[in-house]
């Protein structure tokens, strides 16, 4: 039993990334570019789907939700990482740490559910094309999305409440760049058995079951595609669901590499690199995968935006000018710190 006079900690120290001091500014510029690209790319996908009437379909409603989730998921960890990379005291208050853990769980699990919903869309579109509009009605799509948000809220709230009841009284150094659930459990000085069981049980429901559903839907999709006699039908099917399969592989590939590899192969550097891939890089690549490999995203938005001159100008500014301004700012930042180090 914990002693009453034992001091309770009020903040944690985030060790951050295992980067050499001379490489700090280079990686800061790299992560800043990744974060800005993630924000602009996913925001552009959301705006394009909203403005183009040809994309007002269940599949693209799910895609806009996925882009919003990617945008928010990166914003949970990347700004704090960038701040701590330029700070001499990379601390985070206990309440802020719980909030970061909550939103990290929320948007991570939400993406898993959204990928399952989108896989179901692809499955119906390819395996039952004549009944697609009947099965995937707007009401059905909205119901699946609402269920995903509700289940995600319950999952993140449960873990956060269980974490809030724990006591942290000794070690307050987190060997990570964000407040990860498993890392916080190792620092607790009270009984974490309930948290461990809930994490094991909920992890199976939240990750394993959606992953199995994705595997089964992909297997049915591939078998249906292989039975299509015409080359045009195969190309259309891959154009519809090829980007989604790429995103699924990227998302679950990083999770498997981070959490499901043999424990003997785990080390801090490897786990940190995989966590950066999981929290930053995958969400940056998602809008590019959907835009470059999906014919609807490449074709119809351009035709629609030509009739919206104001937004067309806005698009040119976002895509063309802002990256140049960001690049100039990054170069100036590197030169400033380089001159200080030389002096």
From Swiss-Prot:
Cite the InterPro entries for this sequence. Answer: GPCR_Rhodpsn, GPCR_Rhodpsn_7TM, Olfact_rcpt
Gene Ontology molecular-function annotations: G protein-coupled olfactory receptor activity; olfactory receptor activity
Family assignment from sequence similarity:
Belongs to the G-protein coupled receptor 1 family.
Keyword terms: Cell membrane, Disulfide bond, G-protein coupled receptor, Glycoprotein, Membrane, Olfaction, Receptor, Sensory transduction, Transducer, Transmembrane, Transmembrane helix
Which coarse location class applies to the principal site listed for this UniProt protein?
Answer: membrane
Q: Does the keyword Cell membrane apply?
A: yes
This protein's record includes keyword NADP:
no
- In this UniProt entry, which residues form the Cytoplasmic topological domain(s)? 50-107, 163-195, 264-271, 332-343
Localization recorded for this chain is: Cell membrane
Name it. Answer: Olfactory receptor 1E3
Cysteine disulfide links? 97-179
Q: Which residues are glycosylated?
A: 5
Its lineage opens with:
Eukaryota, Metazoa, Chordata, Craniata, Vertebrata
- Species of origin reads Homo sapiens (Human)
Q: What does this protein do?
A: Odorant receptor.
GO process terms (BP): adenylate cyclase-activating G protein-coupled receptor signaling pathway; signal transduction
Residues in the Extracellular compartment per record:
1-28, 129-141, 217-242, 293-310
Q: Which PANTHER family match?
A: OLFACTORY RECEPTOR
Question: What is the recorded membrane topology of this protein?
Answer: Multi-pass membrane protein
> What is one cellular component GO term in this UniProt entry?
plasma membrane
Positions of transmembrane segments: 29-49, 108-128, 142-162, 196-216, 243-263, 272-292, 311-331
């Amino acid at each position: 039993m914990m002693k009453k006079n034992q001091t309770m900690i009020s903040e944690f120290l985030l060790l951050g990334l295992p980067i050499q001091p001379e490489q700090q500014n280079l990686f800061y510029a790299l992560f800043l570019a990744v974060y800005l690209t993630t924000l602009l790319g996913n925001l552009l996908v959301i705006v394009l789907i909203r403005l183009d009437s040809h994309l007002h379909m269940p599949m693209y409603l799910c895609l806009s939700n996925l882009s919003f989730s990617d945008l928010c998921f990166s914003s949970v960890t990347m700004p704090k990482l960038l701040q701590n990379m330029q700070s001499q005291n990379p601390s985070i208050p206990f309440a802020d740490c719980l909030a970061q853990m909550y939103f990290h769980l929320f948007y991570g699990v939400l993406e898993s559910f959204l990928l399952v919903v989108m896989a179901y869309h692809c499955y119906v579109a390819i395996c039952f094309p004549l009944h697609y509009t009947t099965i995937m009605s707007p009401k059905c799509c909205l119901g699946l999305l609402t269920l995903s948000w509700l289940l995600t809220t319950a999952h993140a709230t449960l873990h956060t409440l269980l974490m809030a009841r724990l006591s942290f009284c000794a070690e307050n150094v987190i060997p990570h760049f964000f407040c990860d659930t498993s890392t916080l459990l190792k620092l607790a000085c009270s009984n974490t058995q309930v948290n461990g069981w809930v994490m094991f049980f909920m992890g199976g429901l939240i990750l394993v079951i959606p992953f199995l559903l994705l595997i089964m839907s992909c297997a049915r999709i591939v078998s249906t595609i292989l039975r299509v006699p015409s080359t045009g039908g195969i190309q259309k099917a891959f154009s519809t669901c090829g980007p989604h399969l790429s995103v699924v592989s990227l998302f679950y590939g990083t999770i498997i590499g981070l959490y499901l590899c043999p424990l003997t192969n785990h080390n801090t550097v490897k786990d940190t690199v995989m966590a950066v891939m999981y929290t930053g890089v995958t969400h940056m690549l998602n809008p590019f995968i959907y835009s470059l490999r999906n014919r609807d995203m490449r074709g119809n938005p351009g035709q629609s935006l030509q009739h919206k001159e104001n937004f067309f100008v806005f698009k040119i500014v976002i895509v063309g000018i802002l990256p140049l301004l960001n690049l100039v700012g990054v170069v100036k930042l590197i030169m400033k710190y380089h001159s200080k180090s030389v002096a």
